[in-house]
């Protein structure tokens, strides 16, 4: 498994770099602020690390389970949803909001504005940079990366759908 870094160069990311790069993505999409912890994992993960006969890192498997799905649609006043939603509202990745059809106001998105939208101990802008770089280190193509972001913004926009009943 080989990846290029976020910068346009011929330098290859090592397998170790790729394994480490999974963390910002797992945290962005799996961690949220709860009443007790600003960066609480809302899913389980099992990481199996493989070594070759010489004791060198040869690969890893990550299995996720039990994602707290209800957190997407509702949060308590002192909590917030998954970090990625708040990261995507930051300017770190220049045209992200435009490409994902997001406004500049987090309060336009009911699913993610019911609780805290800012947390003093979390820098959403910096964390978005880490997440974006991690996608690149993990060999996501530009199209794949933007599809992930667009899917995430679609979830944010789903909270704005209104049901209308028609009587015939």
Regions found by a protein language model. Give the residues of each.
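N-terminal switch/interaction subdomains of large nucleotide-dependent motors and GTPases
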Residues: 1-168
């Amino acid at each position: 498994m080989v990846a290029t870094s976020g910068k346009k160069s011929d330098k290859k990311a090592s397998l170790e770099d790729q394994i480490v790069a999974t963390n910002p993505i797992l945290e962005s999409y799996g961690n949220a602020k709860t009443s007790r912890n600003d960066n609480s994992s809302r899913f389980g993960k099992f990481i199996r690390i493989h070594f070759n006969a010489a004791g060198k890192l040869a690969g890893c498997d990550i299995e996720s389970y039990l994602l707290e799905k209800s957190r997407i649609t509702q949060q308590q006043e002192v909590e917030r949803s998954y970090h990625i939603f708040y990261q995507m509202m930051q300017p770190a990745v220049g045209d992200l909001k435009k490409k994902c059809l997001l406004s500049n106001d987090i309060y336009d998105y009911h699913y993610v504005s019911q609780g805290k939208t800012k947390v003093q101990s979390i820098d959403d802008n910096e964390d978005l940079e880490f997440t974006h770089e991690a996608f690149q280190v993990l060999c996501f193509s530009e199209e794949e990366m933007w599809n992930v972001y667009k899917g995430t913004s679609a979830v944010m926009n789903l909270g704005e759908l209104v049901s209308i009943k028609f009587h015939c």
